Amino acid sequence: MLSLLSSEIFFSAIQYNLSLMEEVRLKKLQELREKGINPYPYRFEVTDFIGNIRKQYEEEPPENYKVRVKGVAKRVSRTENGYMVRLADEKGIEILVFTKEEGLKPKESYTFEGILKRVEGKLSLVEAVLTEEEGEEVYKIKEQFDYDPNFRPVSLAGRLVSMRSMGKAIFGHIQDLTGKIQIYLKKDVIGEEKLKFFNDYIDVGDIVGVRGKLFRTNTGELTVEVEEYQLLAKSLHPLPEKWHGLKDVEVRYRQRYLDLIANPEARRIFMLRTKLITEMRKFFEMHGFIEVETPILQPIASGANARPFVTYHNFLETELYLRIAPELYLKRLIVGGFPRVYEIGKNFRNESVDRTHNPEFTMVEFYAAYWDYHDLIKFTEDMFVYLLEKTLGTLKVKYGEWELDFSPPFKKVRYFDLLKEKTGKDKDFFLKDLEGLRKLAKELEIPDVERMTHAKLLDKVFEKVAEEDLIQPTFVIDFPKILSPLAKTHREDPDLVERFELIIARYEVANAYTELNDPFDQKERFLEQLKEKQMGDEEAMDMDEDFIRALEYGMPPTAGEGIGIDRLVMILANTDSIREVILFPQLKPEKKKKEAP
């Protein structure tokens, strides 16, 4: 049927060690070109996204909506948890029934009672049991929730993810980011030649455009009866095996495009992330915040305690740093008269990679003049309530084995109260007994304690003993000053600062404080950071003279906060790896495969 490979294509197939399936696809591509058909055309008119079409015609039944349905079992098949019955009424309209009842036979009449819900987009009866009570006809049930599309014309495009030929007809499914829909190509509608062309040259994985009319099959599945189609992009590689999807984690992260094609869960996570950021922007706008942009290439590594990435500007002949945090630039804007500002963007920290850390990550930082950290606590609670209601529709979130409750007010606990509860030791021990603290760190099996500064030791001990039991959203408040060089001294205790971290499911999700706006105090804190750096703390901040100068012009009382968007999405999406919520996470260089001798 297909012509032989040209020498050029054949050489390419050998060079890249293509599979037999890939060679066949390459042959098809060559033949399409020989026929004068462009396998990669310029455009296609799309009238709507698939998800919008499905949403319009497939209303979800109310939760736990019970019905009784009668009909004849056209087919009975076993599932993992029981049986699936195709139940049809006198009009031939079908519904899927999922049940654990034994002894069911095709062509027998049954009445089932169960919960009406959609399974893979199809209106179905689940948790169904046989009953002697009178049931309704299937079509009467479907009339309530499966609206008749009345052969509405549509023009849709997507990736072909399934296909089966039945002689005079072809069924398949196309998928875009918003959903999947069945397509139906019929010889009597498109003609024998076009049906044969689709069967011969279109493969699962290809991107196709279809024009036709919507209708429902007897099972109630929303379907496009295709009148015209067009190949929009030929896929030279087969998709991952249908029933198992793409399971290789390394491949999923390196080839995220393939992950998004094959795994509905990956698409769900990144749509959730997009929705979260969209709603976050709306929330800030509602509260009078202005979105701004600050430099990513910065002359001084400051704004947070972290090791920076270093680069070199050839023209300026100077070292620059990828930003650790936008904090000092955002506070300069407060000095300049911007009352409330926020920025959503990338930060970079040249540190370890693990399930909660990626060197390149996304944060939102925001600052409000005339607020203190008490105002931020209330604002943060309100923001989280808003975001969860808009993205998930609930304040209770399943995360691993826990159910997290975001109903305000969140729990609050003081930093040193938590340490005392866990260790029995008070604030003076942690701030004044350095050798005792070092001994405790050794007992906790914290590595490299001899090389750590006082601040680093305290931070590591807190992480080890205090965060383990912080599952529900909890504000840890009133941090030690030695850990917080940019925060304002606590108004009641000079050893502390007015700072909080929001811990959820053991993760630090937010960090905030009443901002230090005294230029003399700030300079002293920077000098202390320089001492820490000289003692070996590579994450200590550098002096920023221009920021001091900005404070000298006067910064009003201000509170600021940073929220890690990646970790927040991890929690809302119920995943335990930050790589699952970053489209293209940082990975080790891919090992090149050895060429065959």
Curated annotation (Swiss-Prot):
Residues annotated to bind Mg(2+) 1:
E501, E508
Q: Which organism is it from?
A: Aquifex aeolicus (strain VF5)
The chemistry this enzyme catalyses reads:
tRNA(Lys) + L-lysine + ATP = L-lysyl-tRNA(Lys) + AMP + diphosphate
Summarize subunit and interaction data from the UniProt record for this chain.
Answer: Homodimer.
Q: Which InterPro entries match?
A: Aa-tRNA-synt_II, aa-tRNA-synth_II, aa-tRNA-synth_II/BPL/LPL, Lys-tRNA-ligase_II, Lys-tRNA-ligase_II_bac/euk, Lys-tRNA-ligase_II_N, Lys-tRNA-synth_II_C, NA-bd_OB-fold
Q: Give the family, as the similarity comment puts it.
A: Belongs to the class-II aminoacyl-tRNA synthetase family.
Upper lineage is: Bacteria, Pseudomonadati, Aquificota, Aquificia, Aquificales
Q: ATP-binding as a keyword?
A: yes
Q: Which GO terms describe its biological process?
A: lysyl-tRNA aminoacylation
HAMAP family registered for this protein in UniProt: Lys_tRNA_synth_class2
Q: How is the cofactor bound?
A: Binds 3 Mg(2+) ions per subunit.
Give the encoding gene's name. Answer: lysS
GO CC terms for this protein? cytoplasm; cytosol
The record's listing under PANTHER family reads:
LYSINE--TRNA LIGASE, CHLOROPLASTIC_MITOCHONDRIAL, LYSYL-TRNA SYNTHETASE
KW Cytoplasm (keyword) present:
yes
Q: Where does the source fall among the domains of life?
A: Bacteria
CDD domains from the xrefs? LysRS_core (cd00775), LysRS_N (cd04322)
Provide the protein name. Lysine--tRNA ligase
Q: Which residues bind Mg(2+) 2?
A: E508
